Regions:
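N- or domain-start disorder-to-order transition segments that initiate the globular core
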Residues: 1-7
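Glycine-rich phosphate/diphosphate-binding loops that line cofactor/substrate pockets in enzymes
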Residues: 12-22, 135-136
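Acidic/aromatic/glycine-rich contiguous surface patches that form carbohydrate-binding/processing clefts
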Residues: 189-271
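Internal, conserved structured core segments that host functional sites
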Residues: 66-156
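Short, flexible loop segments at boundaries between secondary-structure elements
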Residues: 52, 165-195
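Active-site beta-loop-alpha substructure in enzyme catalytic cores
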Residues: 140, 150, 155-179
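N-terminal active-site beta-alpha-beta segment that forms phosphate/nucleotide-binding
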Residues: 18-68
Length: 276
């Protein structure tokens, strides 16, 4: 059985969404299952449903834009986070931010203003940037067939709280090329941890924390996909701090080794000197 655009629109409505939300969607097209028209139909449904609000999809380029390949072109640089964002960024009416490694594409009346100024950021999720502002606008995050390991907003929480050992000490000199060809020099510190190169893989620990009472996330039905929709921390960052700290901090006696996402030291990041 293949799903249709009407099926997808109904599923979004059944989630309790109105279409007026500011919503950031992390997705896996494969997880949705067969859809008549494929990825284009999924995007048609999302753009129609959220036309009154603001639809945001990450169009990250961190896998390819770096010191060795420093030029990000907002019009042509392909994203590295899936087929839906890659097709979405090329659609008429969609605006893409100028962040060289963690750009976001948006569709809606507020897209231009919401995404403006990202060429001025110097970290992936700089406080005051697009990810951080989700909490200020009462935004939502929809995870379609992916886990919290792909929830970039958690990086934003860490940056707001100044969690140490999350960013490289030295910045890369990058360039963001705008739609008119003008270039902006950006000095960007990338995500980096010497003992744990795959920081986000431990973000799945937040699933249990955020589904505890009172729940911050809830499971939703969207065809064959596994979905979760957490509020973008509508509370102050300080409210999110103890949850993030307790969920991500390994036990002091823990000595795991080997494999992706493993902790190779008892404590591979230290929660101290953070700012509220």
């Amino acid at each position: 059985m293949s799903y249709t655009k009407l099926d997808l629109l109904q599923d979004l409505a059944d989630m309790g969404l109105t279409g007026q939300e500011t919503i950031l969607i992390h997705s896996s097209m494969k997880s949705i299952g067969p859809v008549d028209g494929g990825a284009d139909t999924v995007l048609d449904a999302l753009m129609e449903f959220f036309r009154p609000g603001l639809l945001l999809l990450p169009t990250h380029t961190w896998r390819t834009i770096n010191a060795a390949n420093p030029v990000f072109d907002v019009c042509t640089s392909p994203c590295c986070v899936g087929i839906l964002p890659e097709l979405f960024r090329q659609r008429p009416g969609v605006v893409r931010s100028l962040h060289p490694t963690h750009s976001i594409a948006g569709y809606g009346q507020q897209a231009v203003s919401y995404l403006a100024g990202e060429e001025l950021r110097n970290t992936p999720c700089t406080p005051g940037g697009c990810y951080d502002r989700l909490k200020d606008v009462g935004g939502k995050i929809l995870l379609v067939g992916v886990t919290h390991a792909r929830n970039t907003y958690i990086h934003s929480i860490e940056e707001v709280l100044n969690v140490p050992h999350r960013l490289a000490d030295q910045p890369m000199k990058l360039q963001s090329v705008d739609t008119d060809g003008s270039a902006h020099t950006v000095y960007m510190r990338s995500h980096y941890n010497a003992q744990q190169p795959h920081i986000s893989e431990d973000f799945v620990k937040l699933t249990q924390t955020w589904t505890a009472e009172p729940p911050r996330t809830r499971a939703l039905a969207l065809p064959a996909a596994s979905c979760a929709m957490p509020p973008a921390c509508s509370a102050s960052p300080a409210m999110c701090w103890p949850q993030t700290r307790s969920a991500l901090s390994p036990p002091p006696a823990s000595h795991r080794s080997g494999g992706r996402g493993s902790t190779r030291k008892a404590v591979w990041f230290v929660y101290s000197n953070f700012q509220n």
